[in-house]
Amino acid sequence: MDKVALITGGRSGIGLACANRFSQNDYQVITAQRSPAENFDSIKADFSDPETPAQVIDEVIKQTGRLDVLVNNAGVMLEDSVNQMSLNDWNHTLAVNLTTPFLLIKNALPHLKAGSSIINIGSIEGLGSNPKHAAYCASKAGLHALTRAVAVDHGPQGIRCNAVAPGWIDTELNEDFIESMEDPTAFRAEIGRIHPLRRTGKPEEVAALVTWLASDDAAFVTGQIYTVDGGRLAQLPLP
């Protein structure tokens, strides 16, 4: 266990699945979020504070002396239409979902060596849009663009940067949302029907791609955005 992976938002959902997968691959895993992640070293982090990213990277280097993989997974989603959204909500969403990954990458770069990998967790909503998700969509589209820019700027140093754009994944948040519906069973079936594979995704399926992107098997892969959405974006809707 000599390689170190930092995963933001590693307490649940996709972040926890990534932490488990990297740990199984003999990485030392450190997570960063508001609350500790069970079974993993954690750094308490409020990513709405622009000072936090530098502090988190400094703490990782202090604890381990190195950083090999950065997974930018932490994020927020606030629902409101453009005409109703406050500037504070817009700024908060972009601060956590886009500025924080930028600052984490910026502070991590001096410690990343050739062969290191950055994986940003974007969203299919950076490629399309659901109603009332203007700030979220803008932040994820920006994160995809940042991914390509980092790949271009730092590829000559052997540092790779890719993004994964998940669709509907069975995280705790999404499960709670389904259970809040009047008829959860019917809603779950309807969600399945909008996917060619007729089901929603699992956090572990996203984590499998993330760990592959960090591996030597993906050594010639950089600047790419990978959708993990069961074919949802590929399927045109019918009336």
Regions inferred by a protein language model and the residue ranges of each:
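Substrate-binding pocket helix/loop in short-chain dehydrogenase/reductase
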Residues: 81-82, 89-91, 191
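Active-site loop immediately N-terminal to the catalytic Tyr-X3-Lys motif
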Residues: 82-83, 128-134, 156-157, 198, ...
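Active-site helix of classical SDR
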Residues: 105, 139, 147
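Alpha-helical segment proximal to the catalytic Tyr-Lys
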Residues: 110, 152-156, 219
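Residue(s) in the substrate-gating loop at a strand-loop-helix junction
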Residues: 123
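Short C-terminal tail/terminal secondary-structure segment
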Residues: 128, 211, 222-239
